[in-house]
Amino acid sequence: MKKSYRVKSEKDFNAIFNDKQSVANKRFVIYKLDKDQKHFRVGLSVSKKLGNAVVRNGIKRKIRHVLIEHRQELQAVDFVIIARKGVEELDYKETERNLLHVLKLAKIYQEGIPSEKEE
C-alpha cells in the first residue's frame, strides 16, 4: 500500500479520534473522518494483547490485503481500524467478511460502486 494511503502522524490519528465517528463489530472498531481528498487513507492499530510481533504483523497484512483488494469501492475518507481480541484466530476469508461488514456499517465501503476520484 502506497504511503499516500496511510495515516501515520499522531496529529492525524488524534484528528480522526476527536471527530468521534465510530462503528464497531465483534472483531474491529473503525473511527472515521470525512475529508475532501482523492482517495482513502487508513491507519491500523493492533494491540500487543493480541500476540507477539509476528502475529500482529500478520493481522495487519491481512487487513491491508483486504483494503487493497477492495480499494475501488472505498470512500475517500480518513479512517483508523482497531483490531479486537479474537481477530488473530481468523483466517483470511473470515477477516475479509468481518472487515467489510464493519466498513459497510461505517458507510466507507459500498459494494460494486467505484468511488476513487481520478488523479
Curated annotation (Swiss-Prot):
Instruction: Determine the domain of life of the protein's source.
Output: Bacteria
Show the catalytic activity. Endonucleolytic cleavage of RNA, removing 5'-extranucleotides from tRNA precursor
Q: Which InterPro entries match?
A: Ribosomal_Su5_D2-typ_SF (IPR020568), Ribsml_uS5_D2-typ_fold_subgr (IPR014721), RNase_P (IPR000100)
Which cellular component terms (GO) are annotated to the entry? ribonuclease P complex
Keywords assigned: Endonuclease, Hydrolase, Nuclease, RNA-binding, tRNA processing
What GO terms are given for molecular function?
3'-tRNA processing endoribonuclease activity; ribonuclease P activity; tRNA binding
Which SUPFAM superfamilies is this protein grouped with? Ribosomal protein S5 domain 2-like
User: Mind listing the GO biological process terms from this record?
Assistant: tRNA 5'-leader removal
Top enzyme class:
hydrolase
Instruction: Spell out the PANTHER family in the cross-references.
Output: RIBONUCLEASE P PROTEIN COMPONENT
User: Quaternary structure per UniProt?
Assistant: Consists of a catalytic RNA component (M1 or rnpB) and a protein subunit.
Recorded hits in NCBIfam families, A to Z, give: rnpA
Protein task: RNaseP catalyzes the removal of the 5'-leader sequence from pre-tRNA to produce the mature 5'-terminus. It can also cleave other RNA substrates such as 4.5S RNA. The protein component plays an auxiliary but essential role in vivo by binding to the 5'-leader sequence and broadening the substrate specificity of the ribozyme.
Question: Which protein family is it in?
Answer: Belongs to the RnpA family.
What's the protein name? Ribonuclease P protein component
Q: Which organism is it from?
A: Streptococcus gordonii (strain Challis / ATCC 35105 / BCRC 15272 / CH1 / DL1 / V288)
Please state the gene responsible for encoding this protein. rnpA
